[in-house]
């Protein structure tokens, strides 16, 4: 057991200021609400807080096609009508709209996950958190499901520089299809996704029979669930599967995507999980004492997203939080009871004991085929992308500092961050 985990937390106020559109369910403003709730509970004083670097196009192209990345850089609301063919090719439109500062938004959330992975690789922390990340649907050459750049894949690729095997766990209500697809043919990443499946629910993939191919056969695990699963059923299944996966696969690091749309009463969800039930997964994964990268994901009832990720930040810090939400810039959103925890829902649970048992049996049977962790011929670890040495005397105050200089500027108080009352607030 580690005596006390060292936590790195990544946040940039600009990431929550973008606007997908008036009727779009994705509200990045939820990230500002989460951050201010974390501040209100004083959790920032127990972590190392960093502003992430903006991911470079060359970093994004470690997974995504250069043409797609270049188009994301070029497109904006004013010129999008000039590129109807490219818009269709890259799946940009209603679900994945073009909005102001789209590429910078992608740079910030992807940069946070890449930075988190690098700090873990360099043993500068035990746990790294980027609630802005977790956009698991993005594909190599196109956007999907409100996701443009797949930060999770980029983070896992970083972790693979130092770890023979990485375990990816996804508790979003939607199948983690983009991450699974990226690593479907390799045994160096095991993907485990717990999600709603059936009834034409997006993205339509994630059947228990989808297990990977070639070298990756049996290294993709899908746990397809029906409407209404509750805390006890979900947590029992989660503990059984994840404990067996860790025992057999022996990962060097874990990436945990904590999509909050699996909570009860989510605008797009259909599960009955309480915040305690959702957070129990985080608590369980933390107990393995492996390098852990934690991200956000879906979540479309924004006040509950903020509640959930604040509670889970507390769990990662071994800090119990009082249920009464303290005063903060977004306090009005938590009316009328101003409680941190929300209970489970009351949708009929269609996941019968026999159904859950059959899913569990199939998954555990597949795991028998990989009783021994795969052996990996390790090559020389490639360096992180080159960032020029920082000369403090030559630093331009009008230009955002690079990652190395920002690492010297760790802050433990509120004033580091853009707030609604600041003159330069977003």
From Swiss-Prot:
Zn(2+) binds at residues 172, 174, 261. Residues 383-426 are annotated as: Disordered. Coiled coil: none annotated. It catalyses: N(6)-acetyl-L-lysyl-[histone] + H2O = L-lysyl-[histone] + acetate. Binds 1 zinc ion per subunit. Its EC number is 3.5.1.98. The active site is at residue 137. It is found in: Nucleus; Cytoplasm, Cytosol. The keyword Lyase does not apply. It is an enzyme of class 3 (hydrolase). This is Histone deacetylase 9. It comes from Arabidopsis thaliana. The gene is HDA9.
